[in-house]
């Protein structure tokens, strides 16, 4: 259902507030450059430091600006199941086409707890939902066996697999078959995951190089493996640079260097350290982005 190059879009700020004008411009930049779907309020969108009102407004602005040209998949995860249901319902009411739900963080539920959490949200809200597994940030790993149990639910359509493990993504594919789509959550293994049967990527790098990320996915889907491999290797350095510090600090700095919005992040995130900013600037010059 949700396939291709999907951007986890940044949330631009200006003097502490959401910069709606720049957000709309970023949406246009994505659509003009071939992005297949947009995820507002994900990790890259700093959802954890948005108020409930801001969270809803960011989704609303993106839905309005997209105007049905591509799917909008709203980040609606929470470590409270009740809250996740409420946020997902709000996203549906605002016109989102789907929801991306990160595994509950900090409270470290068991696999049974994870299963019940996701099932409860999927039972409560009739909206296509993407599981989001990123144990490096949440402290819990959604195992392939649990994904397989969830994959039979009609409202659970995909998983963003961001363990960085090709083995785990492959195990999900082996266990679930065509019952659920697997999307890479790490730009640097998009091509390997697609080669194993994945359907695309939810990308950080696409914030600054949407055309190239989209072209990689399109080349693979067209059977042009030589071009897909070339783009995969070409994008490795810039994709790795997006994690020179915690996401989304580097990508926001990169977008700012391109003149598209402020690099402003919200505490407890801090601006990119000067030494890392110098490294990022040099890499972006190599790619002729600035």
UniProtKB/Swiss-Prot annotation:
What UniProt keywords apply to this chain's record, in alphabetical order? Amino-acid biosynthesis, Cytoplasm, Diaminopimelate biosynthesis, Lyase, Lysine biosynthesis, Schiff base
Recorded GO cellular component terms are:
cytosol
Residues that, per the record, bind pyruvate: 44, 202
Keyword Lyase annotated = yes
Catalytic activity line of the entry: L-aspartate 4-semialdehyde + pyruvate = (2S,4S)-4-hydroxy-2,3,4,5-tetrahydrodipicolinate + H2O + H(+)
**Catalytic site positions:** 132, 160
Q: Look up the EC number in the record and give it.
A: 4.3.3.7
Q: Name one GO biological process term.
A: diaminopimelate biosynthetic process
Give one Pfam family, short name only. Answer: DHDPS
Give the record's pathway: Amino-acid biosynthesis; L-lysine biosynthesis via DAP pathway; (S)-tetrahydrodipicolinate from L-aspartate: step 3/4
Q: Where is this site: Part of a proton relay during catalysis?
A: 43, 106
Q: Please give one Gene Ontology molecular function term for this protein.
A: 4-hydroxy-tetrahydrodipicolinate synthase activity
Localization of this protein: Cytoplasm
Q: What does this protein do?
A: Catalyzes the condensation of (S)-aspartate-beta-semialdehyde [(S)-ASA] and pyruvate to 4-hydroxy-tetrahydrodipicolinate (HTPA).
- Assembly and binders: Homotetramer; dimer of dimers.
* Protein family: Belongs to the DapA family.
This protein's name: 4-hydroxy-tetrahydrodipicolinate synthase
- Which organism was this protein described from? Citrifermentans bemidjiense (strain ATCC BAA-1014 / DSM 16622 / JCM 12645 / Bem)
Give me the gene this protein comes from: dapA
